[in-house]
Regions:
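N-terminal secretory-pathway/extracellular module detecting exported/lumenal segments
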Residues: 20-172
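N-terminal signal peptide c-region/cleavage motif recognized by signal peptidases
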Residues: 14-16
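Sec-dependent signal peptide recognition
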Residues: 2-8
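Short, linear, compositionally biased motifs with a strong N-terminal bias
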Residues: 10-12
C-alpha cells in the first residue's frame, strides 16, 4: 500500500514538473502557440417584421407535431458564424408561433432573439438572451439544425446556407 502511495505521489509530482516545463518552453518562444480568442456574438438589430415572408416548409419526421417553416428571405450567415432566421411553427389548430432564432452550428447552441406579435406585427425581444445547448429531445429544433447545419457543420457561405434550406424543404 505504501509503495502504491509513493508511486502515485511521484507520478503527480512528475506531471506538475512537466506542466511547469511546458509553460516555460512556450514563454521562451513567442508565437509558438496563440490561444484561440473567445467567441464574441455579433450584435445585430432586429429585422423588420416579416410581412412578405417566403416560407419554406421543412420536411419533418412524424414525431414533430407542428408544421415547421423558415422564411428564406430572413436567412443570414452572420460574421460571428451564426445562422439567423425567422422560424414559423403552425399548430394543427392553425395557430402561428413565429420567432427570430439563431444557431451556432459548431457549438450546437441556439438562441431565440425575439417573438412575433402577429396582431401588432412587431417583434418582442426575448427575455432569455443567452445561447443554450440544443435540446436533443426537441424534434423541432433538431429538424431545423439538420436543415440549416447538416452534419453540425456551419455553412461556409450564404449560398451554401440557402442551398441547405432548399434541400431540406418539403417537396410538394
Amino acid at each position: 500500500m505504501k509503495t502504491r502511495l509513493i508511486m502515485l505521489s511521484l507520478l503527480a509530482a512528475a506531471n506538475l514538473a512537466h506542466a511547469d516545463m511546458l509553460g516555460k518552453m512556450n514563454s521562451r518562444k513567442p508565437g509558438r502557440y496563440v490561444p484561440e480568442t473567445a467567441w464574441q456574438e455579433q450584435v445585430l438589430p432586429l429585422p423588420a417584421y416579416p410581412t412578405t415572408a417566403q416560407w419554406l416548409e421543412l420536411d419533418t419526421p412524424v414525431t414533430v407535431k407542428p408544421r415547421v417553416f423558415i422564411d428564406s428571405n430572413s436567412l443570414l450567415l452572420a460574421e460571428d458564424r451564426t445562422v439567423r432566421f425567422t422560424l414559423r411553427q403552425l399548430s394543427s389548430s392553425g395557430i402561428d408561433n413565429i420567432s427570430l432564432e439563431g444557431l451556432h452550428c459548431g457549438q450546437r447552441t441556439q438562441r431565440s432573439f425575439a417573438f412575433a406579435d402577429t396582431v401588432g406585427q412587431r417583434w418582442i425581444t426575448s427575455s432569455r438572451p443567452e445561447w443554450r445547448k440544443l435540446d436533443s429531445n426537441n424534434a423541432t429544433v433538431l429538424t431545423v439544425i439538420k436543415a440549416l447545419c447538416p452534419e453540425d457543420a456551419p455553412p461556409l457561405s450564404a449560398e451554401e446556407l440557402a442551398n441547405n434550406l432548399k434541400q431540406a424543404a418539403k417537396r410538394r
